[in-house]
Design a protein with these regions (language model features):
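Hydrophobic alpha-helical and helix-loop surface patches within well-folded domains
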Residues: 1-218
């Protein structure tokens, strides 16, 4: 629907213990561990099956550039969850969800890492990430959500479908994804590919103009 057709004959989710490799993905099969709730089970299956696209079809190097599979896959996982479980992104936090200040779960994790000076930029080798550092999931997902809002969802989906068609069953690198963007939008995407994916620079918003309209300020 948003990326491209599933080309394999089947998709199978197998239950297994964490010690036996639960939470791992392979083309056409994913291994799922124990989950307490139906929603969280659906979320895990969605994420792991999503890896059939990232990196089972779009076969990026998940060690050198993990955001191309974990980051993009997490973005689409978030879109799925928002579509089928709207306004419930913080359910996994239990009672703590009352104190999140409106942040979604992934945003909250990233904000915590950033405020603690523990955040890392997504486009680096997986060996460089600290233990259980989920920036490559949460920060990357948030950045591609920003790209979706910047381009508009229809344009974003159109570009990602172009990426899929150009690189399915091949080995894309970040420069290949950037090239697809540059060829399919006139908007400047340097902020994504050369700042927020590759450095720890923070967004610096400013007001460019103020416009009065009736009794409102735009």
């Amino acid at each position: 629907k948003h990326i491209g057709e599933y080309p394999y004959p089947q998709a199978t989710a197998v239950h297994s213990a964490l010690s036996a490799g639960a939470g791992m993905e392979y083309p056409m099969i994913t291994v799922i561990g124990n989950e307490r709730f139906a929603k969280s089970l659906d979320q895990v299956i969605t994420h792991e099956v999503g890896h059939n696209w990232f990196y089972g079809i779009l076969a990026s190097n998940e060690r050198e550039h993990p955001y191309l599979d974990e980051g993009l896959n997490s973005y689409y996982e978030d879109r799925y969850m928002e579509e089928y479980y709207p306004n419930s992104s913080n359910d996994n936090l239990g009672m703590m969800s009352k104190f999140t200040g409106g942040f979604e779960e992934n945003e909250l994790i990233y904000q915590y890492m950033g405020r603690s000076y523990l955040d890392q930029f997504p486009d680096q080798h997986s060996e460089n990430f600290s233990l259980i550092n989920y920036d490559v999931y949460t920060k990357s997902s948030r950045l591609f959500e920003d790209a979706e809002e910047y381009l508009g969802v229809d344009n974003f989906d159109r570009i990602m479908k172009k990426y899929y068609e150009a690189w399915k069953f091949k080995h894309p690198y970040p420069e290949d994804l950037e090239k697809v963007y540059s060829e399919n939008t006139e908007k400047n995407m340097d902020w994504l590919f050369h700042y927020f994916l590759t450095t720890n620079k923070k967004m610096d918003y400013r007001i460019s103009k103020i416009k009065h309209q009736n009794d409102s300020v735009l």
